[in-house]
Amino acid sequence: MLSVRSWAQLARAKFNSTERGGVCRPLVSFLGVIYLYKKAFRKALNLCGAFDTLKYRREFQREHPFYFNPCGTLIFSGPQGSGKTLSAVDYVTRIMEEYPHAILCTNTEFTDYPFNAVVAPEPNGEMSVRDYFSHELITHEWICDRLSENSSYRVCVEYSGLDCLKWVNNGEYGVIFFIDEFHLELNSLESKNIDIDVMVEISQQRKQRKHIVGTSQVYMRLAKPLREQIKDVVDCHSLLNLFQWNYIIDGEKSIEKDGQLEPVIVGRSFFFHSPEMYRRYDTYAKMKRYNKEWQGRSRVPSFDLFKREG
């Protein structure tokens, strides 16, 4: 059996031979030799490549005019009366105005975007989005036909649980999920029970052109696996329910210390409330937990949440 010194001598000899040959450069560890293809990291700094990339992006945008750019998880946080839902609804409304071909999936009743689509099973066992009244399959061509008849038309699916994150898809045209009181679905007390399929959907939003927007009274109440995937946080504040000021926090750079978030503020937003903003949704609607189980896994009953906090 080779001693540690013998392993080191063998690794050094292998290192010298492969370095001269230029094939690969090994990394020496206590367990042996890990080979790394060194040439793959040698790239010339070609400035033309940057211009070619910009040209490619312009052409892509021209060929895909309805491509859905927003992605990642955004949380509006603040206590009751802080204007977090008002701010979040305003944010979602602006996105829907900018991207009319996107699908909205939410647990909030929007005045301008009534529920008009449902998630329904297909004969092959898969789930799809269909029109609530005609039961027609909703495709991009179907959406284009409706927009040609009514430019203010938007597809809106009622959120019915975490499964919607997987079932509602819209290709490059995007899906925006707005989940009010998101901590009721994914909270810190149940972080160990989060199914891997949920995290797959949350962590791959960019590839699927999905954007999750949620609200939470306490940011730290959200499950830790979810907090690790949050890109941005909006800390909401309201003065006399008239003036709103929000801090935009970089969720990826901010750190948690002693159960508190040490924010890295990257922006601010200010605006006055208006009757139009309040008319956009039912401000007194009560949110609920949608599923007692997800993918066959039972969830903690609501009354246990407070019992386990003590």
Language-model features: where?
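Conserved nucleotide-sensing/catalytic segment adjacent to the nucleotide-binding pocket
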Residues: 113-200
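Hydrophobic positions on the alpha1 helix immediately C-terminal to the Walker A/P-loop
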Residues: 87, 91
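Hydrophobic anchor at the beta1->P-loop junction of P-loop NTPases
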Residues: 76
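Conserved P-loop NTPase motor module
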Residues: 7, 15-17, 26, 232, ...
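N-terminal pre-Walker A segment at the start of P-loop NTPase domains
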Residues: 27-65
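Loop/turn-to-beta-strand initiation segments
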Residues: 101-102, 173-176, 208-214
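Conserved lysine of the Walker
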Residues: 84
